[in-house]
């Protein structure tokens, strides 16, 4: 263990040296708050449901709870999550969008978690759910990063034996955390943070994230039902469509709007908000193929003579006199050969 620490420290330093300011700031905040926990009580930085809502309004905890850790292994998970997000997501989104994503996920996890425990208190009247539960840590952001990786590189293989793709990792980890919770090896706020991180990040990436093609990602491979096994996807898809229709009616979500753009004079580009570039390229190739087939059929038809040309040729043959093989003969005289000279008879003298 002591031999591995210097190598890991050196590797982490090399990664952070090439990271952006956002990644460095988040990692520094995690380390600072962890070291601060040895000197003072940092419980006021975690989301406590009874203190977040009125009359206390500990609003700042929505910004700090995702950075607060109390164990060294939790610090390692937080740093690894931030570094992975910086290496894989920041080149696609940019540093500002990564910071926005981090803020949206953590604020949503804090609000949804506090509201869930408030409902639990209203059902059980147990004050533990209001003033003892503390929501903190990077598991919520970890769930958001895994959802974003499913969106961007879902077909990548994480394990070869057994074969595990990135697209199934979010639900696999959720199942693992659920088993740990049932075995009392994990506290309920950690499981709640991860679950709400999955939901909030998917909603943001699906409907609200801004990019060059519009807003959100309505691709089929990123539908909510794709997070579940194939046998459950039809049922989950039906329920998700019902919920989405309800949210559209109350104007929380917007309808899927198709946008048609003429990309070039030689082709037509049909783009949907959040469409995968590979899908757009495939549609473009199909459109070009269909256009080439139509042009080929038109060229083949132009080779055959038209009916109008046939009728004109037939009419010309009818109007023109048929040449005779023999010249007309006068009775009692021999045949006179044809002559191309034209003779004129002398006109009578005028008076």
From Swiss-Prot:
Topology class, membrane: Multi-pass membrane protein
Subunit composition and interactions: Homooligomer. Interacts with COPB1. May interact with LMAN1. Interacts with the COG complex; probably through COG3.
Designated name of the protein: Transmembrane protein 115
PANTHER family per the UniProt record, alphabetical: PLACENTAL PROTEIN 6 (PTHR13377), TRANSMEMBRANE PROTEIN 115 (PTHR13377:SF3)
Family under the similarity heading: Belongs to the TMEM115 family.
Main subcellular localisation: Golgi
Cytoplasmic side: 1-19, 119-126, 187-351
Taxonomy of the source species: Eukaryota, Metazoa, Chordata, Craniata, Vertebrata
Role of this protein: May play a role in retrograde transport of proteins from the Golgi to the endoplasmic reticulum. May indirectly play a role in protein glycosylation in the Golgi.
């Amino acid at each position: 263990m002591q031999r591995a620490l210097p190598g890991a420290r050196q590797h982490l330093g090399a990664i952070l040296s090439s990271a952006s300011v956002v990644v460095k700031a988040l990692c520094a905040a995690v380390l600072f708050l962890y070291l601060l926990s040895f000197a003072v009580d940092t419980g006021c930085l975690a989301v406590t449901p009874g203190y977040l809502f009125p009359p206390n309004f500990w609003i700042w905890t929505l910004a700090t709870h995702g950075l607060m850790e109390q164990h060294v292994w939790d610090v390692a998970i937080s740093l690894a999550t931030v570094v992975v997000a910086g290496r894989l997501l920041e080149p696609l989104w940019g540093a500002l969008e990564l910071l926005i994503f981090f803020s949206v996920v953590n604020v949503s996890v804090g609000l949804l978690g506090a509201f869930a425990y408030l409902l639990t208190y209203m059902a059980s009247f147990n004050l533990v759910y209001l003033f003892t539960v503390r929501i903190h840590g990077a598991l919520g952001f970890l769930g958001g990063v895994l959802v974003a990786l499913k969106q961007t590189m879902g077909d990548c293989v994480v394990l070869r034996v057994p074969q595990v793709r990135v697209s199934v990792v979010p639900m696999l980890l959720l199942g693992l955390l659920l088993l740990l919770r049932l075995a009392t090896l994990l506290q309920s706020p950690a499981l709640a943070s991860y679950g709400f991180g999955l939901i909030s990040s998917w909603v943001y990436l699906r409907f609200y994230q801004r990019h060059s093609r519009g807003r959100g990602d309505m691709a089929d491979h990123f539908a909510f039902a794709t997070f579940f096994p194939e046998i459950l996807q039809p049922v989950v898809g039906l329920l998700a469509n019902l919920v989405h229709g309800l949210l559209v009616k109350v104007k929380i979500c917007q309808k899927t709007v198709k946008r048609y753009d003429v990309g070039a004079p030689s082709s037509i580009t049909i783009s949907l908000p959040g469409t995968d570039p590979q899908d757009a390229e495939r549609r473009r190739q199909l459109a070009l193929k269909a256009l080439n087939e139509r042009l080929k059929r038109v060229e083949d038809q132009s080779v055959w003579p038209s009916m109008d040309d046939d009728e004109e040729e037939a009419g010309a043959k009818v109007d023109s006199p048929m040449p005779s093989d023999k010249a007309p003969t006068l009775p009692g005289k021999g045949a006179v050969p044809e002559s191309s000279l034209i003779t004129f008879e002398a006109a009578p003298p005028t008076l």
